[in-house]
From Swiss-Prot:
The lineage of its organism: Bacteria, Bacillati, Actinomycetota, Actinomycetes, Mycobacteriales. It comes from Corynebacterium glutamicum (strain R). GO terms for biological process: gluconeogenesis; glycolytic process. Monomer. This is Phosphoglycerate kinase. The gene is pgk. Gene3D superfamilies: Phosphoglycerate kinase, N-terminal domain.
Amino acid sequence: MAVKTLKDLLDEGVDGRHVIVRSDFNVPLNDDREITDKGRIIASLPTLKALSEGGAKVIVMAHLGRPKGEVNEKYSLAPVAEALSDELGQYVALAADVVGEDAHERANGLTEGDILLLENVRFDPRETSKDEAERTAFAQELAALAADNGAFVSDGFGVVHRAQTSVYDIAKLLPHYAGGLVETEISVLEKIAESPEAPYVVVLGGSKVSDKIGVIEALAAKADKIIVGGGMCYTFLAAQGHNVQQSLLQEEMKETCTDLLARFGDKIVLPVDLVAASEFNKDAEKQIVDLDSIPEGWMSLDIGPESVKNFGEVLSTAKTIFWNGPMGVFEFAAFSEGTRGIAQAIIDATAGNDAFSVVGGGDSAASVRVLGLNEDGFSHISTGGGASLEYLEGKELPGVAILAQ
C-alpha cells in the first residue's frame, strides 16, 4: 500500500512544526492505577523520539478503556504520561482536556522537541460517534491544535481497524503519514497474508469462537494447520460430542463449528487432554483429564500436557507461524502451562527451524510478558489483536486505507 511514512515526513523536515500523533496507549491498569504491561508504550517510543529529536512540537492523542464519552478519572491518561516521561527521559505534559482551553494553551506553548499528551480522546463523545458531521467537527478542533503547517502521524496500530475521529477523520484534514510502528505492522502482516512460507501454522486461542470464525474461514485456504485452544476450543469439542461440563461454551456456535470441522477437519488440530478446575479461581482444585473426563460441575481452564506436546510437534516443522489468543487462563499460574508451552514451542521453531513467527497482539502478547518469556524469541509481537485479525481476514482497515488517500 502506497502511503507516506514517518521517514518521508522527517525528510520534509519537522523542525518547529506541530505534529499530531495517534498512539495506542490502551494499557492494562491494576486497582492502584499502575500500568501492568507497558508493551504498547514501549512500542510507541521510536516514532515519538524521532519526531522530538527532529525538533517537532509533538501532540499525542490516545484513548484508555471505554469511558463512554464522558470525563471519568478512572480512565485518565495520567499514568501513561508518567510512564512516557520515564521511558523517554524527558517530561511529557498531560493536558487537562482534549480540545479545551488547557490543551490549546499547552499546544501553543510547545517548543521544539516538546511532547504533549492530550487527555483521553474518548472523554469526548464525538470520538466514537456514528455521526460523520460530529466526528468531522471534532477532527477540525483536534487539527486546530496543530496550527499552520501541521501534520498527522498514525502510529496506533491497535486502533486502525476503527473509523474513529482521532484515527480516521483527522487524516482527511492534515498531511498524513504512517508512523514507524504502523509501517512495520503492515509490512509484517502483508508478508504473512500474501506470501507465507509453508508449512504455515496458525494458533488460535482466546474465549470466543465467534470472534475467530472470519479468520478461520480466511486462513483455512492458506494455512497448513490451524491449532485451536483456549476458551474457544470447548465449542469445537462439544460439536464433536464431548461433554465439556461447565467449560466456556458458545452453544449457538456449535453448528458453525460442526460445519468448520466438516470442511477443514484435516487442518484443524484440537486438544486431546485438558486441565480441569473445580471452579473459576486461581486456587481451584485441578486435575489433568482426557476429553470426556471433566468431573461433573467442573470446567476446563487450560489445555493438558499431551495437547502441548502434540501442538509442539506440529509447530516444530513450521516455517510461518501466526499466534492469536492464549491456550488457557494464563493469569492463574496453575492454568498457565498450556500457554507457556505453546509460546515456548513457537520460540523453539523460530530459532531451530528459522520460522517467521508473529504474535498477534492482545492477550497473547500480554501472556508473553506476564509469563516472563523472551520477547526477542519471536520474529514480531504485534500491538494490535483485533486489527491484525481483521487484516488477515482480508478486511479493509479504515485507519490505514485513509493514509493512502
